[in-house]
């Protein structure tokens, strides 16, 4: 993302590789710690770090990645370093806030769609958006163009999460690479769960609450049946498309040649049409 943000405005500069590496290290740090908090057994079709090596080792591995990320950032040109560090650190704090909200929501009976979108924006979208903007800063983009690129990434990130929530419920385990139904088992308030609690008839709403409290062996299948009765799979597709449209509007507003934006359009298509 960072490299693409740079390349949208100028030839790739050495600083872009340093920042991109820092972002990737930070991202994997968050995934390792998120998997611990979620007690997730799989990530990308393989054992999670804590599942394979233990929680203590996983915590330290994540911490080491965060330290390494800052080490890469210290190597960049001093002219752009203040702006890069400010955005990177702001994003890291927002991602942490988003993860805390995600955990808080698991304990609440009701979460609004607006609250969930805010949580997802912080936990997921801002990192995608900041990666693009960091590259844009290195590439010499003006403030307006950099902001439109950020908003493109932010809206694309929400669309990505809608797709991720959908795949967690309805995806093919062989393609998804994670435990299908994991969000349901963890009582996560996903886009699908929030809509089901809002749109389902009274009897299904009561059943959903009972399933979250009692955790029967067939919990995942029962919840999926409720999702389908409420039509949340079609609703999720419509919601995803709305955020894609917002993202593309901001991409169109960036004042560079259209052909330079084509890789970002292709990336957007890949992220929101993926099956893994």
Give the residues covered by each predicted segment.
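All-alpha prenyltransferase/terpene-synthase fold signal
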Residues: 1-276
């Amino acid at each position: 993302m960072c490299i693409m943000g740079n390349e949208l405005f100028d030839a790739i500069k050495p600083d872009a590789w340093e920042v991109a590496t820092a972002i990737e290290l930070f991202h994997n740090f968050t995934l390792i710690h998120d998997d611990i908090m979620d007690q997730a057994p799989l990530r990308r079709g393989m054992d999670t770090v804590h599942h394979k090596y233990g929680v203590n080792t996983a915590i330290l591995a994540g911490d080491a990645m965060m330290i390494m990320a800052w080490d890469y950032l210290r190597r960049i040109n001093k002219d752009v370093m203040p702006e890069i560090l400010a955005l990177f650190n702001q994003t890291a704090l927002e991602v942490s806030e988003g993860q805390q909200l995600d955990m808080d929501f698991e304990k609440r009976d009701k979460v609004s769609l607006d609250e969930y979108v805010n949580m997802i924006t912080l936990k997921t979208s801002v990192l995608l958006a900041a990666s693009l903007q960091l590259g844009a800063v290195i590439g010499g983009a003006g403030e307006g163009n950099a902001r439109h690129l950020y908003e493109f990434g932010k809206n694309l990130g929400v669309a990505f999460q809608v797709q991720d929530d959908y795949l967690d419920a309805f995806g093919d385990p062989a393609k998804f690479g994670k435990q299908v139904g994991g969000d349901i088992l963890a009582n996560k308030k996903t886009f699908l769960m929030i809509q089901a609690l809002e749109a389902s008839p009274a009897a299904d709403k009561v059943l959903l609450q009972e399933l979250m409290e009692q955790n029967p062996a067939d919990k995942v299948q029962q919840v999926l049946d409720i999702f389908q009765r409420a039509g949340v799979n079609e609703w999720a597709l419509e919601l995803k498309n709305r955020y894609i449209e917002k993202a593309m509007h901001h991409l169109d507003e960036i004042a560079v040649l259209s052909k330079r934006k084509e890789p970002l359009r292709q990336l957007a298509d890949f992220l929101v049409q993926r099956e893994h």
